[in-house]
Regions:
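ADP-ribose/NAD+-binding catalytic cleft of ART/PARP-like enzymes
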Residues: 1-24, 56, 60-62
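Pocket-edge structural micro-motifs
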Residues: 5-8, 33, 142
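Short, charged/polar surface micro-motifs in flexible loops or helix N-caps
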Residues: 10, 35-38, 62-66
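Extended catalytic/binding region for NAD+/ADP-ribose chemistry, centered on the ART fold
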Residues: 20-45
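Conserved NAD+-utilizing ADP-ribose enzyme module
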Residues: 23-24, 44-163
Length: 163
């Protein structure tokens, strides 16, 4: 399957070591099946770092037998607790090779943050989340899995039309 990663660099040899720790699914290499989402990620990173926005395109093998996969089909209490724990820095992803689920992007995380800070309960947050258009993310949580399943295809620069 073709997947995408938004960046400010051409990443022919992706790695986990450069990942930030406090992400939705913890430390890992994040990809998506939505090209437009990767473009938005790239543009956002490019604007913050004052660099070119680059989308890297990869082939992700779908031969996942033998890998430890955690898949969140939708936002539910397990997804919410997992994302909040990882965003606090807990290393829950070490139990898995691949984690799949929806993105707690800026808009979604504003809602999740209400739960994170104890202002809303789970039911309120999950009820609000159904109004958001969600995108997916795939976190490859360790280097061995990344090396075995992900192959670089190409990269291209995204022109930010907001400039």
């Amino acid at each position: 399957m073709i997947v995408y990663h938004g960046s400010t660099e051409i990443i022919k040899k992706p790695d986990v070591i450069h990942s930030k720790k406090y992400l939705d699914f913890g430390k890992g290499f994040y990809i998506t099946t939505f090209e437009d989402q990767a473009k938005r990620w790239a543009v956002r990173k490019g604007m913050r770092q004052e660099k070119a926005a680059i989308v890297n395109v990869y082939e992700l093998s779908e031969k996942w037998d033998g890998f430890r996969v955690l898949s969140f089909e939708k936002e539910n209490d397990k997804w919410l607790d997992f994302v909040c724990a990882c965003r606090k820095g807990q290393s829950l992803n070490k139990e898995y090779d691949i984690i799949i689920g929806n993105v707690a992007d800026d808009d979604v995380f504003k809602t999740v943050d209400m739960y994170f800070r104890g202002l809303w309960d789970k039911e309120k947050v999950l009820g609000e989340l159904r109004y958001y258009k969600m995108n997916n993310q795939i976190c490859i949580a360790n280097q061995e899995t990344l090396d075995r399943l992900v192959v670089f295809k190409e990269s291209y620069e995204v022109v930010n039309s907001d400039k």
